[in-house]
A protein has these predicted regions:
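Conserved functional hotspot residues or short segments at active or partner-binding sites
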Residues: 1, 311-312
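Long, charge-dense accessory insertions within large macromolecular proteins
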Residues: 2-35
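Cleft-lining beta-strand/loop regions that shape enzyme active-site pockets
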Residues: 22-39, 46-48, 54-59, 63-69, ...
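Conserved catalytic motifs of ABC-family nucleotide-binding domains
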Residues: 73
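Catalytic palm active-site di-aspartate
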Residues: 76
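A post-motif C-terminal structural segment
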Residues: 294-302
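Extended catalytic-interface subdomain
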Residues: 301-311
Length: 312
């Protein structure tokens, strides 16, 4: 029922704007997890074959591992939220099963597991914090003859706005740059290929690491009100040779960052002849009554709504 409702609303929003989407509550949580790099789950990776959704690996120290009841190749038959009626996940895609397993910190999820010998059992687990560090910025040093080149991969312009100590891509990029400077690299490559964008605030902060100070991007509302977002902090973290790698899937914040580096003549932008071409800004608008103290989870999810356009 929820899936049909979500599909119905998105069929309407897509007629008006390709970047406006309705998120059902579980999809809203998934979007927040992607942006923050943090979720609450059981510490297991899933896979799928003809037998259904299976356990591919168990993270040492995680809830599944600590239970001692879940092992690789166990098939997940049903998933229940606490004492609620279990959902039969036979025929589910792995991504849909994952959304049911994840939830709020400290809450209970019950998995009906089928063992390789055909026996079934219900395993009760308490969700714990999991960090998606593979989605964070990371760096490497490339040896080019007698010279060292620094390489930084940024998959998304992620930001955890719900937790003060949460992950921020601009802070992580600064840490990686400091590591590369300590290695005495001759230049740095920042790879935003396949980076679909993310936080507008973070891209301004990140561009400020490579310029002294100044405007980064202008945003404009439907009423025509313009606002310039600038790096207000004097000083440059890294002033050496810089290359930004893009491709046709580099969108939104990636395009803002590459454009700022180009406009300030701080580095070269290399890759495809054009990037994705997304020039709009979205915000999440919650639907329904809050389901938690912070209002992060709401009764009917949220709409990611286009509010503004951005300009170089």
């Amino acid at each position: 029922k929820e899936k049909r409702f979500e599909s119905f609303l998105n069929s309407i929003t897509s007629l008006m704007d390709p970047h406006t989407d309705y998120f059902a509550p579980v999809e809203k949580r998934s979007f927040t997890e992607q942006m923050s790099g943090t979720f609450y789950g059981i510490g297991a990776q899933l896979t799928q074959d003809d037998n259904g959704v299976k356990i591919a690996s168990v993270q040492p120290g995680g809830a599944a591992w600590k239970s001692g009841l879940i092992v690789v190749n166990d098939v997940i038959v049903k998933i229940a939220q606490g004492a609620e009626e279990p959902v039969d996940v036979t025929g589910y895609e792995t991504t849909d099963a994952v959304k049911l397993i994840r939830g709020d910190l400290g809450t209970e999820v019950r998995l009906t597991i089928r063992k390789p010998d055909g026996t079934t059992k219900v395993v009760v687990l308490i969700r714990e914090k999991i960090v998606l560090d593979e989605g964070f910025a990371r760096s490497a040093v490339i040896q080019n003859g007698n010279e060292k080149i620094g390489y930084i991969l940024l998959p998304d312009f992620y930001a955890d706005f719900e937790r003060e100590e949460g992950a921020r891509c601009s802070k992580d990029i600064a840490k990686e740059v400091e590591k590369l400077k300590a290695e005495k690299v001759k230049g740095i490559i920042i790879d935003v290929r396949y980076n679909g964008g993310g936080s507008l605030y973070e891209v301004v902060q990140m561009a400020g690491l490579f310029i002294d100070k100044g405007p980064i991007v202008q945003i404009r509302s439907k009423e025509g009100r313009a606002q310039t977002l600038s790096d207000e902090t004097p000083g440059i973290l890294y002033d050496g040779p810089l290359v930004v790698m893009v491709n046709e899937f580099s969108a939104s914040a990636s395009e803002i960052f590459a454009g700022a580096i180009q406009d300030y003549k701080r580095g070269l932008v290399v890759g495809s002849t054009s990037s994705y071409g997304k020039g709009t800004v979205q915000r999440n608008v919650a639907f329904g009554k809050p389901l938690d103290a912070m209002g992060i989870q709401t009764e009917y999810g949220a709409v990611k709504l286009t509010f503004q356009k951005f300009y170089r």
